[in-house]
């Protein structure tokens, strides 16, 4: 989840830096991924997705896939080693054993929930047809 959220936040922040509105930036990051790309990849496979998208998206995906892989490979290597050597388990046990664990966790989650990106997301999700209120 951290990798996915981190990538989404990075793209969102880049779009905002270049003048995109919060809702537009959210649509171009989270909505496109969760409402389209990941569902099609799960149903049909990444090879199908590559073969059936626009030529612009296709070319960009092919040209940038390797760069993204190389950018995150060291992070996955570090994470794997930290899981393997017990560092991550130790952190979890230490954090979860603190008497104020729940308050600290709630503060971390509130920071995310109250960020501009996820506040925009709440508004955008309300616009999805499945979330429209039914009239009596």
Model region roles, listed by residue range:
Residues 9-12, 17-136:
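NAD(P)-dependent Rossmann-like dehydrogenase/reductase catalytic/cofactor-binding core
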Residues 1-2:
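A short glycine-threonine-serine/GTX helix/turn-capping micro-motif
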């Amino acid at each position: 989840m951290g990798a996915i959220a981190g990538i989404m936040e990075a793209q969102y922040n880049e779009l905002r830096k270049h003048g995109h509105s919060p809702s537009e930036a959210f649509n171009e990051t989270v909505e496109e991924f969760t409402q389209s790309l990941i569902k099609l990849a799960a149903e049909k496979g990444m090879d199908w997705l590559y073969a059936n998208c626009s030529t612009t998206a296709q070319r960009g995906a092919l040209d940038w896939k390797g760069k993204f892989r190389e950018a995150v490979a060291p992070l996955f290597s570090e994470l794997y080693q930290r899981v393997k050597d017990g560092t991550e388990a130790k952190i979890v046990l230490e954090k979860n054993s603190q008497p104020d664990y729940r308050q600290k966790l709630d503060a971390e989650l509130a920071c995310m929930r109250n960020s501009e990106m996820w506040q925009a997301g709440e508004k955008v999700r309300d616009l999805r047809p499945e979330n429209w209120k039914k009239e009596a």
